[in-house]
């Protein structure tokens, strides 16, 4: 049995910040440290990060969480990584430096290119990758960098470039450049991975004109990849720690919520909103605008999921605060929403960077419908929170159709899961029970569980289940006819934003 004074260290690299968390054997979070990094918007629809800044902030969070907790690096059993997916970095193998900023998952610069493929090609890509051709995924971002950064194609030809999503970049840096790997969940989100062979796909590489030699080796989500370099924690500290997990953030939340059985669903409310349902070892093809994705993997097995990705969720609340300036902070939104009824039927469609699942419309843009002279700030705040729910419900409804079964319970996490108004409205609209765990750090816990299983810190899923505690459960308070009326208004509103950019140009 592992010593109880040993801990798991998880690096949670998100869209706006890098975090480090220390977990004990009972699943308690001992300490958390967070460092924000800069968002770059060089052109309309473009979103970039500085990969060096990401590394520096992640390393800073790692060192600070150890200092803050008083835990020595020698007490860390192993390190796991969970990360924002799809964000693409290409760096020079000889210098270790990026040749361009990391292009973020939200970036839309390749939207026009994604419209150039014929129906047969789109179907081939979906069949092989489980995904659709969309700017969201890494493949078109990688192509853009290779095509637009001077000399990039030549350097790739000479074998001097390396591509990775953020997990690969961090593992490379943490190991001092010794290890160049990714995991099944992150690899699959590139558009370059075959979900049937669980390897890079030559046809997809050819389609996007991406050389195989720049790609990392694919490993499972739960195994030892290598060790941290000497001096990572401080100049005099030569401790080397195992890196034993890598998993995309949404898949990590699914595992952290212990949705380990087929049909179990989790909803994460972060910058975007991401809904996954476990389909076990079965690859389920969606006919309703969802993605087939890898849920998680071990050395001997790969598990799959259906996923719906909503581009704007918590970011809509940031928009209320930072752009419209009608709330001072996110916490206030719950109070404002409770001040008014929904009888004015105001709808906000926050498609600021297009619509994700199940619509997949890169040319939609945000809109507010149903305004009249009586509309107040409270109505707009309420409608913005409701929009997060409506978008999540569109995905849940598609899952019901693809799975051909009801979804009666889903587990929630993420910052907005603390908003009781939003969670009750989610239960109402989806006509399902909503369960929120006491430990809201489910994304970090998923990676921690993966690490623990890899190194024997936890023996099996039954041990993991003992760490899960429920904070609250909510059940629907509206009837189905009432809900149907509200959803009808949402459907009209969202459809009126379709193809907006295309139609006005």
UniProtKB/Swiss-Prot annotation:
Binding site for ADP: 15, 19, 271, 314, 415, 419
Identification of the protein by name: Glycerol kinase
Matches recorded under PROSITE patterns: FGGY_KINASES_1, FGGY_KINASES_2
GO CC annotation terms, alphabetical: cytosol
Pfam families tied to this protein: FGGY_C (PF02782), FGGY_N (PF00370)
Binding site residues for glycerol: 85-86, 136, 249-250
Record-listed E.C. numbers: 2.7.1.30
Protein residues bound to ATP: 15-17, 271, 314, 318, 415
GO biological process: glycerol catabolic process; glycerol metabolic process; glycerol-3-phosphate metabolic process
UniProt-annotated binding residues for sn-glycerol 3-phosphate: 15, 85-86, 136, 249
Keyword Repressor tagged: no
Keywords, sorted A to Z: ATP-binding, Glycerol metabolism, Kinase, Nucleotide-binding, Transferase
Protein's job: Key enzyme in the regulation of glycerol uptake and metabolism. Catalyzes the phosphorylation of glycerol to yield sn-glycerol 3-phosphate.
CDD domains listed in its UniProt record: FGGY_EcGK_like (cd07786)
Activity regulation field: Inhibited by fructose 1,6-bisphosphate (FBP).
HAMAP family noted in UniProt: Glycerol_kin
Pathway participation: Polyol metabolism; glycerol degradation via glycerol kinase pathway; sn-glycerol 3-phosphate from glycerol: step 1/1
A GO MF term: glycerol kinase activity
Domain of life of the organism encoding this protein: Bacteria
Keyword Lipoprotein set for record: no
């Amino acid at each position: 049995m592992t010593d109880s004074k040993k801990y798991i260290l998880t690096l949670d690299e998100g869209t706006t910040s890098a975090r480090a968390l220390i977990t004990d054997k009972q699943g308690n979070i001992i300490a958390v440290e967070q460092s924000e990094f800069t968002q770059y918007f060089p052109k309309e629809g473009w979103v970039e990060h500085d990969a060096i800044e990401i590394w520096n902030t992640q390393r800073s969070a790692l060192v600070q969480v150890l200092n803050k907790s008083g835990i020595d690096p020698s007490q860390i059993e192993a390190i796991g990584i969970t990360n924002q997916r799809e964000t693409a970095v290409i760096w020079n193998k000889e210098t270790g430096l990026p040749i361009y900023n990391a292009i973020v998952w939200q970036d839309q610069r390749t939207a026009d290119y994604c419209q150039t493929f014929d129906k047969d090609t789109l179907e081939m890509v979906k069949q092989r990758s489980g995904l659709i051709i969309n700017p969201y995924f890494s493949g078109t971002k990688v192509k853009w960098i290779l095509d637009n950064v001077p000399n990039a194609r030549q350097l790739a030809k000479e074998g001097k470039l390396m591509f990775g999503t953020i997990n690969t970049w961090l593992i490379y840096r943490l190991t001092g450049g010794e290890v160049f790997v990714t995991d099944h969940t992150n690899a699959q989100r590139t558009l370059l991975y075959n979900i049937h062979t669980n390897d890079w796909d030559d046809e997809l590489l050819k389609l996007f004109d991406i050389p195989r030699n720049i790609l990392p080796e694919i490993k499972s989500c739960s195994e030892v990849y290598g060790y941290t370099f000497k001096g990572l924690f401080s100049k005099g500290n030569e401790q080397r720690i195992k890196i034993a997990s890598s998993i995309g953030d949404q898949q990590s939340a699914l595992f952290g919520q212990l949705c380990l059985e087929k049909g179990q669903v989790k909803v994460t409310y972060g910058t975007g909103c991401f809904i996954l349902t476990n389909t076990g070892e079965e690859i389920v093809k969606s006919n309703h605008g969802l993605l087939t994705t890898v849920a998680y993997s071990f050395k001997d097995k790969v598990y799959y999921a259906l996923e719906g990705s909503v581009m704007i969720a918590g970011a809509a609340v940031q928009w209320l605060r930072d752009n419209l300036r009608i709330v001072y902070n996110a916490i206030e939104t719950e109070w404002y929403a409770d001040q008014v009824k929904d009888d004015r039927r105001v709808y906000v469609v926050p498609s600021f960077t297009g619509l994700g699942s199940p619509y997949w419309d890169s040319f939609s843009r945000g809109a507010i419908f149903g305004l009249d002279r009586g509309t107040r700030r409270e109505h707009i705040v309420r409608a913005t929170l409701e929009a997060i729910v409506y978008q999540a419900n569109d995905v849940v409804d598609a899952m019901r159709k693809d799975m051909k079964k009801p979804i009666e319970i889903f587990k929630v996490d993420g910052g907005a899961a603390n908003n009781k108004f939003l969670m009750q409205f989610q239960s109402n609209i989806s006509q399902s029970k909503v369960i929120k765990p006491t430990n809201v750090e489910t994304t970090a816990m998923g990676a921690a569980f993966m690490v623990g299983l890899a190194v024997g810190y936890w023996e099996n899923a039954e041990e993991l289940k003992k760490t899960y505690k429920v904070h609250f459960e909510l059940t629907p308070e509206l009837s189905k006819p009432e809900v149907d009326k509200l959803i009808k208004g949402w459907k009209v509103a969202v459809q009126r934003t379709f193809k907006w950019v295309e139609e006005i140009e």
